[in-house]
Swiss-Prot record:
Region annotated Disordered, chain positions: 98-129
PANTHER family in the record: RIBOSOMAL PROTEIN S9 (PTHR21569), SMALL RIBOSOMAL SUBUNIT PROTEIN US9M (PTHR21569:SF1)
Family: Belongs to the universal ribosomal protein uS9 family.
Alphabetical keyword list: Ribonucleoprotein, Ribosomal protein
Gene Ontology CC: cytosolic small ribosomal subunit
Coiled-coil zones: none
Protein name per its UniProtKB record: Small ribosomal subunit protein uS9
Biased composition (Basic residues): 110-129
One term of GO molecular function: structural constituent of ribosome
Keyword Nucleotide-binding in record: no
Organism, scientific name: Chlamydia trachomatis serovar L2 (strain ATCC VR-902B / DSM 19102 / 434/Bu)
InterPro entries reported in the protein's UniProt record: Ribosomal_Su5_D2-typ_SF (IPR020568), Ribosomal_uS9 (IPR000754), Ribosomal_uS9_bac/plastid (IPR023035), Ribosomal_uS9_CS (IPR020574), Ribsml_uS5_D2-typ_fold_subgr (IPR014721)
Gene Ontology BP terms: translation
Length: 129
């Protein structure tokens, strides 16, 4: 079994640090349980998807520290961190993780506001005459 693997995931402004160790299924997110921090079942399923590829979810303990961004950004950042931690544990499932898109860092970020415009792309009203 594994001693401990640590990995980081990012999405927009959200940064997540995930510690994966063998245990009995205890998941700690910023000092709270997974159900308290991420109340929606969809969010929890998204986060735990890479761990399900290893098999038994309850044979691992997770300690997650996440900060910045919104809730969905934190969910995707945590999923990426968990997928990287799982990859350190089991190298042979890399192709499966990659096929599911769990190892892909989403590069999209907020576009900066340009001068002479209201927002990043929105201009002031233009009058031809």
């Amino acid at each position: 079994m594994i001693q401990e693997s640590v990995a980081t995931g990012r999405r927009k402004q959200a940064v997540s640090s995930v510690r994966l160790r063998s245990g009995n299924g205890k998941i700690d997110v910023n000092g709270k349980t997974l159900e308290q921090y991420f109340p929606l079942e969809v969010q929890r399923a998204t986060i735990l998807a890479p761990l399900r590829m290893l098999g038994d979810v309850n044979s691992f303990d997770l300690i997650i520290r996440v900060s910045g961004g919104g809730v969905q950004g934190q969910v995707i950042a945590t999923r990426l961190g968990l997928a990287r931690a799982v990859l350190q544990e089991k190298e042979d499932i890399k192709q499966e993780l990659k096929a599911q898109g769990f190892l892909t860092r989403d590069p999209r970020k907020k576009e900066r506001k340009k001068y002479g415009r209201k927002k990043a792309r929105k201009s002031f009203q233009f009058s031809k005459r």
